[in-house]
Amino acid sequence: MESEYVLCNWKDQLWPAKVLSRSETSSNSKRKKAFSLEVQILSLDEKIKLDSTETKILNKSQIEAIAASLGLQSEDSAPPTEETAYGRSLKVALGILNERTNLSQASTSDEEEITMLSQNVPQKQSDSPPHKKYRKDEGDLPGCLEERENSACLLASSESDDSLYDDKSQAPTMVDTIPSEVETKSLQNSSWCETFPSLSEDNDEKENKNKIDISAVMSVHSAVKEESACVKDEKFAPPLSPLSSDMLIMPKALKEESEDTCLETLAVPSECSAFSENIEDPGEGPSNPCLDTSQNQPSMESEMGAAACPGSCSRECEVSFSASNPVWDYSHLMSSERNFQRLDFEELEEEGQASDKSLLPSRINLSLLDDDEEDEELPRFILHYETHPFETGMIVWFKYQKYPFWPAVIKSIRRKERKASVLFVEANMNSEKKGIRVNFRRLKKFDCKEKQMLVDKAREDYSESIDWCISLICDYRVRIGCGSFTGSLLEYYAADISYPVRKETKQDTFRNKFPKLHNEDAREPMAVTSQTKKMSFQKILPDRMKAARDRANKNLVDFIVNAKGTENHLLAIVNGTKGSRWLKSFLNANRFTPCIETYFEDEDQLDEVVKYLQEVCNQIDQIMPTWIKDDKIKFILEVLLPEAIICSISAVDGLDYEAAEAKYLKGPCLGYRERELFDAKIIYEKRRKAPTNEAH
């Protein structure tokens, strides 16, 4: 049986056990060798002897099958006091198997990582003799393992001294490679522990350690792992008991656990009785290759003396191992080894360079050294610049009052207040206009995700206007992209380069309808006279004068259309029985009159009267002269409409024909406020058209 842990039949059950010793027994068969094994039941102190044929190799599938049959739960499902001895033994065995599996997987990843690092580190050779490293031949390795298992757990300090002096007398040898299979088997068949002195002793001994031989580290692939482990022991670990060199190879994948795991073990003095069971014999095993024997001989003797006495162990080291849980020493070994792996590989390189400063290096690759100096990473200061969402001159979407989202230009920005002054994109943009100040939250970037949806919404009421704005912005971006123009959209609109786009708004078919900001139509017209300035600060009541005139004109429409009170008067004018100044001007006019006074301000009222007059013309079509039939619309607007309105005013208001005609010529009676607003509108239109005419 080559396995360290087996399954044996004890008390009618398969119990996991640890092999303590094996001895060959006589057998009738010459081919098969029988062994007598002495095993210890895991988590129990029971030691039994049995034949090798009565045991099975311990594997995970068998343990899980037994646990499933017993209905065992996970490790954290119940307190340890409630578990049976058989259940504890199975869980200890399962934990050992899991540790083996993780160890083998991590060693594979460790080899790959060190292989990549070895390609980037320059090799260095020291004049000092390399550290001693001993191992037995591969053929004698099984015998060596048997000797370790059969040897006594404790040795006298004199024996350890002899082994140390023997190590010193041997000649220095180069690091030899050990196959991965031998490494794995040595990890499985050896257990060990270490003592932890005080921090001050650790610091003193760090100064006395020899530096690592970098050339030996990078020469052979497997030697890299051994030497890196040795350096970690020299830098961070206190003096250790002589251990197998194979046990120092630990994968870097086990770095995750912190050093608290090892420190917590110092507080368990009651378990120190099992301390000596896991220390190997220094006389038979290879010496520690990481320690200088000439410097560390007193410390090694003190270690062996401390290991020989359990009582002194509890007083000096306070390191203990549980006798009831044999897997505890194994897990502690793993956690302590993880602490040695915390040294970064770059620190190894720096340490090797520091130790070889005064030595003459051999076979130095200068190009590699130069590359290392160039690849040295200096401290980096990462500056996070805040990207402002809006900038001056940026085109955005802005929603104002009842209008939909409309393209606008940012004139200025106040960062602290997070506000921007914007102007709508329209046919009469002017950089001198005062924009409206709004919060950033009310703005959207022009190329946002909702761009198409905003355009479609604006097309519902401003189809031509929004299309013109989009074409203006697209043309501006094309000019910026090709480099033919540099500047903001406002500057582009005022320049001659934008005239092909601006001239579209001057066409008769274009509806000049754009959203207006409050300061365009309200404040600027009100600045015409002092009277309107005062009114801008007062609450303006709605104008009722126009409504009163519409009601009075409604009576005139009823008299003309419904009562047909003007029909006889109109027929008399057409027949020539009554004279009319409007008929004379119509006959003498050489061209179409540019302006006609309608008197009616409501278009509905005017349409109603014109339709009635067309019916009258159809009735008298037979008797109408030929010169009237050629242009009926002109005859209705210039002759019949004024005569009908004058006749209705005379009849409704009780005036004679001359007074009614004078009232018609005077037109509607406008109020003072209506006149001011109308004059201000005219002046504003003239001012607005003046810059555009100069640009052309």
From Swiss-Prot:
Modified residue annotations for Phosphoserine: 128
Pfam families tied to this protein: MUM1-like_PWWP, PWP3A-B_C, PWP3A-B_N
Per the database record, which ranges form the PWWP domain?
Answer: 392-453
Keywords for the protein's UniProt record, in alphabetical order: Phosphoprotein
Q: Does the keyword Electron transport apply?
A: no
Query: Which portions of the chain have biased composition (kind: Polar residues)?
Result: 119-128, 290-300
**Which InterPro entries does this UniProt record tie to the protein?**
MUM1-like_PWWP, PWP3A_3B_4, PWP3A_3B_4_C, PWP3A_3B_4_N
Name the segments for region: Disordered. Answer: 119-143, 278-303
Q: Which GO terms describe its cellular component?
A: extracellular exosome
From what superkingdom does this record's organism come?
Eukaryota
Q: Which family does it belong to?
A: Belongs to the PWWP3A family.
The protein in question is named PWWP domain-containing DNA repair factor 3B
Q: What is the lineage of its organism?
A: Eukaryota, Metazoa, Chordata, Craniata, Vertebrata
Q: Its encoding gene is what?
A: PWWP3B
